[in-house]
C-alpha cells in the first residue's frame, strides 16, 4: 500500500486524530468529511476499531503498510510488550526525531528534510527517513542547510522537546539519549488494538 499523499486535514478528520500535531484540523469540524456532517459516524465493529487504530498510527508516522508491518514484526521479536516495543521503534525513526527536535512543523516536512539530504547522524549524511536512531547517536542539520527558512520558522514556534532528546538550538543538534518510554508517547493510541488486528 502506497504512502498517503492527499490532504492531511481531511484524513485527520476521517481518523479523528490530528496528524499535523497542531490539533487545528479538528477545532472547527471534529467529524469526518462528507455531506452528512457530524451525524454520519457509524458504530464500528471490533474489526473496524482495530483497523481504525492501525490506520491512525500508520498515518501519524507517515508510513506505507509494508514499512509499518515490518516494524511491527521486528517489535514482536524484542523482549517485553509487543505493542509498547512497536511504539518505541516507530518513535526512533529519523524523520520522527527530526520532527520531535522541532526542525520541522510536521512529520511530512521532517521526512522531506531527510530525503533531501539536510540531516546528519553522527556527522554523516543520512537520507533515509526510516533510519532507526540508536541511543547516544547525534542528529544535526548539515552546515549548508542551517539557513533553511523552513527550519528557522519551525524552531521559532516549537516550545517542546521530549526528555529523551537533548537539543542545542544554536547548533541545531540533538542527542538521542535513550529510547522513549510508553508514557511519553501518544496517549490517544491504543496499541493493543493494533496487536489484535495483526494477530487475527
From Swiss-Prot:
Q: Per the record's keyword annotation, is RNA-binding included, yes or no?
A: yes
Region (Disordered), start-end ranges: 22-42
Q: Hey, which family's this protein in?
A: Belongs to the universal ribosomal protein uS4 family.
The UniProt subunit note reads as follows:
Part of the 30S ribosomal subunit. Contacts protein S5. The interaction surface between S4 and S5 is involved in control of translational fidelity.
**NCBIfam families reported for this sequence:** PRK05327.1, rpsD_bact
What PANTHER family does its record include? Answer: 30S 40S RIBOSOMAL PROTEIN (PTHR11831), SMALL RIBOSOMAL SUBUNIT PROTEIN US4M (PTHR11831:SF4)
- Return the protein name: Small ribosomal subunit protein uS4
Amino acid at each position: 500500500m502506497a504512502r498517503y499523499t492527499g490532504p492531511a486535514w481531511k484524513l485527520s478528520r476521517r481518523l479523528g486524530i490530528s496528524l499535523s500535531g497542531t490539533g487545528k484540523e479538528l477545532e472547527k469540524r471534529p467529524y469526518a468529511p462528507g455531506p452528512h456532517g457530524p451525524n454520519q459516524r457509524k458504530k464500528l465493529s471490533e474489526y473496524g476499531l482495530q483497523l481504525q487504530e492501525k490506520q491512525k498510527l500508520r498515518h501519524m508516522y507517515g508510513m506505507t503498510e509494508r514499512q509499518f508491518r515490518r516494524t511491527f514484526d521486528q517489535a514482536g521479536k524484542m523482549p517485553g510488550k509487543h505493542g509498547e516495543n512497536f511504539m518505541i521503534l516507530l518513535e526512533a525513526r529519523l524523520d520522527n526525531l527530526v520532527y520531535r527536535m522541532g526542525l520541522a512543523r510536521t512529520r511530512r516536512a521532517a521526512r522531506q528534510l531527510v530525503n533531501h539530504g539536510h540531516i546528519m547522524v553522527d556527522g554523516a549524511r543520512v537520507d533515509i527517513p526510516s533510519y532507526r536512531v540508536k541511543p547516544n547517536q547525534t542528529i544535526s542539520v548539515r552546515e549548508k542547510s542551517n539557513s533553511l527558512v523552513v527550519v528557522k520558522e519551525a524552531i521559532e514556534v516549537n516550545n517542546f522537546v521530549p526528555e529523551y532528546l537533548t537539543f542545542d538550538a544554536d547548533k541545531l543538534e540533538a542527542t538521542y539519549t535513550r529510547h522513549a518510554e510508553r508514557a511519553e508517547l501518544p496517549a490517544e493510541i491504543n496499541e493493543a488494538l493494533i496487536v489484535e488486528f495483526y494477530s487475527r
